[in-house]
Structure formats: C-alpha cells, structure tokens
Amino acid sequence: EPANIDDNGASVAGWTQTSYQEEFNALVKRVKNDGGFWVARFETSVDSNNVAQSKQNQKVLTNTSWYNLYTTQKSLTKGTTTSHMIWGCQWDQIMIWMKDIRNNNVVQGSRYFIINSSNMGNYLNTEIKISEDQTKRAGEAFRFKSGEVGGAMIKNIYDLAGNVWEWTME
C-alpha cells in the first residue's frame, strides 16, 4: 500500500496514511528499544491450515499481492513479538550488514552504496544447480521449498532473492 495513497483508495480494511505512519513510528521505537530487529531465516510459507510461518522445507508463498502478504505477515504476530512486512530501510540495513560478503560495492566517505546485490542473494536470471528431488515440477517451472537453495544463504538467512519480488512496506 503506497504511503501516498489517498485514505479512500486503500485496499486494506481500515488502512489510512495515519495508520501507515503509526506503523513506521512503532517500528522505529522497537528498533531503538531493542537495539535492532530480526529477519526470518526462511522464506514466508503457509502450513496445511494456510497459517503463515517461516520454517525449512515448506511450500513458499508466491504469486501473491502486496495486500495479501501484508495481512499474512501480520498474522505471525504473537504476544510482544511483532511480525510485519519488511520496510525498505530495514532491507537496506540487511544489505549493509552483509556488505562484507562477496561484494563489489562502493564506500564514499561515510556513505555506502550497493551497486550489485547479486552477491548478497539477489539473483535475477541466475542458474542454480539443484537436484530433482529438491523440487516439485509446476508446469514448465520448478517450485523450491523454503531453505532448499543453500547457495542463496548468507549469514544464515535463506534466499533474499525473493519469492514475492521482495515486497516492502513502501
């Protein structure tokens, strides 16, 4: 849901620009209080009851809309542990945290520029060698289960390349 959307044009029930800003403010407060944030180790998947999860060897969530992913991620919130789609600024921080991993990026003064994220798990048009038993044929393509592509794991986080084009809150 873009931040600049008119309150009357929102597709998520009860969504307003104010609620969007409040979510971001709450994130900033949590990061300050906790000294950081966590990111799920495995891609978002759903169990047999269609409940969202982040577990290895599961059917990953694909071909979904921003709105569905937003709602799905929220469903993982339990107690004081919150779950939400990652914000762009969090994505950027993950990439910076991984900057020393197989990179060819640029540092200018105190600024850091990611000029090629393929070394950080972003693999457009990349061939990944994997055995037949690790996949399920889906038409003319193969569907990987969560955590299957070990070569796409960096700092123990699997496949930042994306199954939902890495939707972010923005």
For each predicted feature, which ranges?
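Short beta->alpha transition motifs characteristic of CBS
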Residues: 149, 167-170
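Short aromatic-cysteine micro-motif
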Residues: 2-160
